[in-house]
Amino acid sequence: MNWINGGIDRDSTLAPLPDVANRFQALYDSFWNQAHLAPSTLELCRLRLAQLHRSAADWSRVDCEIDAEKREHLADWSSHESFSDAERACLEFTEIYAMDVQAISDELAEAVKAHYGDAGLVTLVEALGIFDGMTRLSLLWQLASVEH
């Protein structure tokens, strides 16, 4: 339960504002239904943000099913063999984004573009903006971890 309205998760917290909730959900869903970047890669990036920000609520959330081994070894993405080069490029970009967006180098952007093109890079940046913002709101709202 959060301190705003007693909601237990993001959806129930936003429910009293149906216009906002519906528009946000449409935007959020669009990331999982686009053709430029694999949804499983976006989920890895979203989960990595949850790890970095220590958000149990966002870590427990499942927006896209991913390989259990990847989830288990996400903190070791740079060295674990289960991650592809494309996933590594996106995860490295995600970590820098989380720490200091101004520190994102041309090389990091080019690494993502090498796998996903310009449209994939734009999709990643837009998704990270939403994921990072929602992770920070989960912490601010003090949302609890919810089993799905």
Show which residues each predicted segment covers.
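Hydrophobic alpha-helical segments
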Residues: 1-148
